[in-house]
């Protein structure tokens, strides 16, 4: 009854690191691939798509620019997309429009979407906000844009 989430930005090394009995993956393991910008989406997602993994989640965090997931037809192979801004004193801005674009792609592809956190610097409706760490998750939740569809 235990399910593991393994998060990596090194999906290009994944096939070299799996156990010999991995096959097409384990039922109780989800491998999550992080992407922070379009450059890394274009590099990592084709590798991720072709990897022998039963359950896949894309984590766009820290979200550093708008990312177009449409070319990857995520509805065919992704369980969920997670989006979130960067935390910490050196955090870079996260634009709410970038988050909404990801959410819209998930909506059209019937993929679950979770807006996890705003990040420390959040831009919405022409205004910049500095958000304390303790409120970043709750502020994202208040946006009310999470999508449950596509969940198994």
Cite the ranges covered by each PLM segment.
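Core AdoMet radical
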Residues: 1-17, 21-66, 78-94
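Auxiliary Fe-S-binding modules of radical SAM enzymes
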Residues: 64, 69-152
